[in-house]
Each structure stands twice: as C-alpha cells, then as structure tokens.
From Swiss-Prot:
Quaternary structure and partners: Eukaryotic translation initiation factor 2 eIF2 is a heterotrimeric complex composed of an alpha, a beta and a gamma subunit. The factors eIF-1, eIF-2, eIF-3, TIF5/eIF-5 and methionyl-tRNAi form a multifactor complex (MFC) that may bind to the 40S ribosome.
Region (G1): 49-56
Lineage start: Eukaryota, Fungi, Dikarya, Basidiomycota, Agaricomycotina
PANTHER family, per database record: EUKARYOTIC TRANSLATION INITIATION FACTOR 2 SUBUNIT 3 FAMILY MEMBER, EUKARYOTIC TRANSLATION INITIATION FACTOR 2 SUBUNIT 3-RELATED
Region (G4) residue spans: 193-196
GO MF assignments: GTP binding; GTPase activity; methionyl-initiator methionine tRNA binding; methyltransferase activity; translation initiation factor activity
Domain tr-type G: 40-250
Name under which the protein is recorded: Eukaryotic translation initiation factor 2 subunit gamma
Region of interest (G3), residue spans: 135-138
Pfam hit, one: GTP_EFTU_D2
Family membership noted in the UniProt record: Belongs to the TRAFAC class translation factor GTPase superfamily. Classic translation factor GTPase family. EIF2G subfamily.
Function: As a subunit of eukaryotic initiation factor 2 eIF2, involved in the early steps of protein synthesis. In the presence of GTP, eIF-2 forms a ternary complex with initiator tRNA Met-tRNAi and then recruits the 40S ribosomal complex and initiation factors eIF-1, eIF-1A and eIF-3 to form the 43S pre-initiation complex (43S PIC), a step that determines the rate of protein translation. The 43S PIC binds to mRNA and scans downstream to the initiation codon, where it forms a 48S initiation complex by codon-anticodon base pairing.
C-alpha cells in the first residue's frame, strides 16, 4: 500500500536520527484552539451501519478521501480494515449566506480562510472543526473490527439505506455497540442514504420506520438527514450537523496515552539498510500531549510464554521521530483525531497491524496489563444482527463456566475463557494479555452459527496484574 495518500503511514517521513523533545505549554491548548485544529483533527466520528449502506461513500463525499485502499477491499468493493480520513469543516462568515449552504467540507490540507464557493457570495470561510472519520466495516463477520473502531469514537454517523427495509441486522448490532462504548446520544446523526433511488412517498414511509426503530435507543435524539452520498446531495446539511458535535473535555496536562488501532511497516521491498525507517503506529490520543523526540513505551509489547504457559510481557520502548495528521507534519499532537506516530521500533513488529490494541504512553506511565479480569457483566435481552423467526433462538443465554468468548477491551481483541460466575460478576481468563483500567468497558461476543455475535458488555472491576520484564536497554 502506498504511503503517499495514507494519513497514518505518512508519519514515516520523519527523520530517523535522534531528535530533541519539543517544548509545549499545554495549559494554553484546547480542542478548538486555531493553532491545533489548523493542523490536526480533534474529534473522531465513526460511520456505522449495515453492509453496502454507503458508509465509505459518505466519508468520500465529505472528505474527498477514498478509505477503501487495500487490493482485496477494492476487488470485493467492501471495507475490511478500518478506514480513516480527515476533513476540515468551514463556515462562511457572510451573514447573508444561509445555512446549511454556508457550511463546506474540504480535505485537511486546505488553507485557513478559503473563499466561499456559493454563487453570488464573496465572503471568507472560517475553520469550525477538524474531524477524523473512522470508517467501520458493515459485514457481520467483521463485527470485531467495528468494535475496535468504536473504542475511539466521540460521535457517529448511522447510515441507513432508504431502498431497504429498516432495521437491517448490522444496523441494530452497530447501534448496540455505540451504547456499550458510551457514545453521547447527542453526538449521533442518522443519515437516510440513497434518496436518489426511491420516490418521495417511499422515503417518508422509510423515515417513519427509522423513527420507530430508534425509539428507546441511544440514537433516540439523533436528527434524520436524507442524503445521497453518490450525488453529494445534502452533504452540506451533514457537515452542519457535525459542527454541533462538541469535542470531549480532554485532559491535556495528564500523562499522554494513545490507543493503537493500526500499525505499519512502510519500508518498500528491496530497501537498503540505510534507507530503513522504524515502524509506524496509528491511533487516537486519549489524554495528554505527545511531542516529537519524546521517549515512549508501547504495552503489552512482546508477549512470551514459558513451558508452564505463564505469560511474560516486555514493553517496547522507543523515541517519537515524527508525528503526522495526514500530510500535516506536527511538532506535538493533542487528544482526538487519528495520528500517525513514527518510531524507531523494529518495523517487523509493526507490520500488518501487529500493534493493534496496544497502548502507547510515557515510559513507566502505561496502564496495567491483565491476564485475567473480573467484570460486572450485562447481557443483551436478545441476539442482534441475526435474522430469525424463532424467538427462543434469538434470546441470549446465560454465561457458563468454561465457555469461550471473544472480548474487546478498548481497541484490543482477545479470546477469553470464563473461570467463575457469581451473580452479575464474571471472571475471564484472557488468551493474550491486554491493557485496561478499572471501570473500563468491555464488549463480549459469543460464537453463534460460525460467527461472533455481540451478546453483552461489562465493566472491569479488577484483575490479576501481569508480571512484566522490561528490557534493560
């Protein structure tokens, strides 16, 4: 995959020699500071919904970026890995320029004050938001990938195709995932897509079915906007709605921490030893500020097992050599948005998303690593994402000791075996160690009809902390 148009892989273009740590006064920064949003996104918006309802097309209509990049994705015309794209949203300052026409989105390389493109308007536009889109796959077998993307979302666009009945299986499953992760109901926007394929009367009936579907769900407050992503119809109304999504109150002064959702080896085949670049980690900063030249640690890092099956973790330590938000080179990166971090880590350890789910932090300031967790679990009343006429089959059965589940902790994905069940509390032995904090939410999936299906969620109470071995060098 080419790194030229890749917002995360672009981070590899930084220098390979040691660099001095940048000094930043974090007390003067906010998520909407002009000097921040001019260079990097500070809010993550996910696109969710059933397969082929227009998630990637909507991101392309807003940002101009094609998120489907890999050969197998292009051949099958579906999203398989998490897609990502940045966009700047501007508003015309001419009071005679009416909404939503006064809103316009551009790629993240756009200048600070472009001229308004509405015919007859000579006003200038001001930057309102800089947004990262997390484009999730809609196929049922890729639900685990969707949950990884949901871990970094601040808001969401729920795509529902107007030419199909509502709800489709993954529409409900993705909406439940938003509720589990805890996305604010005010930060969800419903897009009734493919309006160019239906009559007005059909669109109105479909809109009523959407309203009925979202009653009592986390999307109950969401506005419903009719759009056509292919024709870019009503996209100005969508970006106006995105401007109503406020960035979270990030803690800029806390110890920096970033969850990794993609990682790359950006070296071309046949590159000489002198040309090799370190691995690139892509993800979203949760708190604090990362700076070029800073010493960082990636946990859990290298995981080994002895003859008795006891796990040992060796966190990876490195220095940040570059920070990128798409083509924008950064000296420091703040929470929100998707950031590419160029490091000196062996690229073989980063290729093919091998750092997925790991956490980057200052040295010695990372989260605890668990091999077993105890969590308070809440099961869904019925199975989502499955078409069935049998009500008994659709009900979610109780958890039993010895059962194997698929567990999403933050962006990490691992198997888990239930070792104890007591009331609503469950102990789960993890197949591979994972970073988490007490109180963190987890998603649980059970294997049903050869697919992992979302069955519930939980809150981490405690766990057996993993013994670590830190590389003395």
């Amino acid at each position: 995959m080419s790194a030229i148009n890749d917002p995360i892989a672009a981070a590899s273009s930084g220098p390979s020699e040691p660099v001095q740590e940048v000094q930043v006064d974090v007390t003067k920064l906010t998520a909407l500071s002009p000097e921040v949003i001019s260079k990097q996104a500070t809010i993550n918006i996910g696109t969710i919904g059933h397969v082929a309802h227009g998630k990637s097309s909507t991101v392309r209509a807003i940002s101009g970026v094609q998120t489907v990049r890999f050969k197998n994705e292009l051949e099958r015309n579906i999203t398989i890995k998490l897609g990502y794209a940045n966009a700047k949203i501007y508003k015309c300052q001419n009071p005679d320029c009416p909404p939503p026409s006064c809103f316009k989105s551009y790629p993240s390389s756009k200048e600070a004050h472009p001229k308004c493109e509405r015919p007859g308007c000579d006003g200038r536009m001001d930057l309102q938001r800089h947004v990262s889109f997390v484009d999730c796959p809609g196929h049922d077998i890729l639900m685990a990938t969707m949950l990884t993307g949901a871990a970094v979302m601040n808001g969401a666009l729920l795509l529902i195709a107007g030419n199909e009945s509502c709800p489709q299986p993954q529409t409900g499953e993705h909406l439940a995932a938003l509720e589990i992760i805890g996305v604010d109901p005010k930060n969800i926007v419903i897009l009734q897509n493919k309006m160019d394929l239906v009559r007005e009367s059909e669109a109105m009936e479909h809109c009523e079915s959407i309203k009925k579907f979202v009653e009592g769900t986390t999307a109950r407050l969401a506005p419903i906007i009719p759009v056509s992503a292919q024709l870019k119809f009503n996209i100005d109304a969508v970006v106006a709605a995105i401007c109503n999504i406020a960035p979270p109150n990030y803690d800029f002064s806390a110890d920096p921490r970033m969850v990794v959702i993609r990682s790359f080896d950006v070296n071309k085949p046949g590159a000489g030893v002198d040309e090799l670049k370190g691995g690139v980690a892509g993800g979203s900063i949760l708190q604090g500020v990362f700076k070029v030249g800073q010493e960082v640690e990636i946990r859990p890092g290298l995981i080994t097992r002895d003859a008795n099956g006891v796990c040992t973790c060796r966190p990876l330590r490195s220095r940040i050599v570059s920070l990128h938000a798409e083509q924008n080179h950064l000296q420091f990166a703040v929470p929100g948005g998707l950031i590419g971090v160029g490091t000196l880590v062996d690229p073989a350890l980063c290729r093919a998303d091998r750092l997925l789910g790991m956490v980057m932090s200052s040295v010695g300031k990372g989260p605890s690593i668990y091999v077993e967790i105890r969590a308070e679990v809440f099961l869904l009343r019925r199975l989502l994402g499955v078409k069935t006429d049998d009500s008994k089959k659709a009900k979610v059965g109780k958890l039993v000791v010895g059962e194997t589940l698929f567990v999403n902790i933050g962006a990490s994905q691992t198997g888990g075996r239930i070792t104890a069940v007591k009331g609503g509390d469950v102990s789960i032995a993890l197949t591979t160690p994972a970073c988490c904090e007490k109180g963190e939410k987890i998603a649980l999936s059970r294997r049903i009809d050869k697919h992992w299906r979302l069955i519930g969620w939980g809150k981490v109470r405690s766990g057996g902390t993993l013994c670590e071995v830190v590389d003395p060098e």
